């Protein structure tokens, strides 16, 4: 009787493994429901290595590769086993309607966020509750209340810039802008600022640790299990410096045995910061007070999202205005005409009425998209018809604010920085196609804050 040796078993196992992947590749390329759509064949066989190459190895270049693929193949490109990229403003409008039934793709969002947070929550019902809890802290009314404090922080930053200029010291505008926005968003989320503006060279370990953690996002979307292992290993080490900032604020609630007593909450929470609202069980019907770990997760997500997105747009805007003298002069003349003295108080509502300032900010947000990557959504159980073809439920449909804000059917000379496009007769039609803040039930809660940052920065600068 023949008894296979260890080498024989190894060869057999390898052969079966190779055969499995060959058959799987044949199925995905020729028999999968999405096989009719064109795109990179390697992506159709396996998302992981394709994403790793473009996003990690080439440092975030996948969105530009997808843009090239759309030019080659058209508005629909297969970019994964079960993934389609759509570059069509009208399809985007249909997908983002409140009644569309599209939901966040949990495979993607668990890689870039924490489960159960305002960004990471994929259940529509739970997401609505969390959004209702956070809305008061991020509303236009709250923007008005904190507008003077924002201007104080901008002035503090500019004083440091002036001191550097007097001593001929070079500063990093990226670090300066990120320090400003972090101090503002920490006030909104935690109830107090972290103090990044006062740090030497505007460098802060809190920001650097957050950036280091979220740089793993490129690996996470390609190899989710590896990312999970990396985060677990990080939690076992001393990589938790953000807790040193957040715990003093959350522990005062979590450590109390009477945390669910409304009177005790009311005595401690001024309801001005996100943490106060999260810890109040009466904030919204159906809201459950999160644990300390869940609070930390939400804080990290809000601080990171609020800092990176806003500061990147601000940096982009400053560059574009300084690089375009006609825009600079027109904007300066409008501001000087309405507010002759830099010491004059300017309110958020007054600034929103200035047409060229508003147009400039819209153009900054169009081209300097805070979140340029893909935002995948799952087709609902009822399915979805795309150009006459029925797509099966749970297919992941990817759209991108970067692509939507540059689509030539909507934007003439889409790569040109031109605030005047927002002052034409048909400019109101453009607003619904501005994909910067998403649309529908998933519209960005921080939209008003982004506008206020830009106004404060441009006015003072």
From Swiss-Prot:
Cytochrome P450 monooxygenase; part of the gene cluster that mediates the biosynthesis of the phytotoxin solanapyrone, a causal agent of early blight disease of potato and tomato. The prosolanapyrone synthase sol1 is a polyketide synthase that produces the octaketide desmethylprosolanapyrone I via sequential condensations of 7 malonyl-CoA units with one acetyl-CoA unit, and one methylation step. The octaketide backbone is further methylated by the sol2 O-methyltransferase to yield prosolanapyrone I. CDD domains: CYP58-like. Glycans are attached at residues 307, 324. It holds the Pfam family p450. The chain crosses the membrane at residues 7-27. It is a single-pass membrane protein. This is Cytochrome P450 monooxygenase sol6. Heme binds at residue 444. Its EC number is 1.-.-.-. Its cofactor is heme. GO terms for molecular function: heme binding; iron ion binding; monooxygenase activity; oxidoreductase activity, acting on paired donors, with incorporation or reduction of molecular oxygen. It is found in: Membrane. Keywords: Glycoprotein, Heme, Iron, Membrane, Metal-binding, Monooxygenase, Oxidoreductase, Transmembrane, Transmembrane helix.
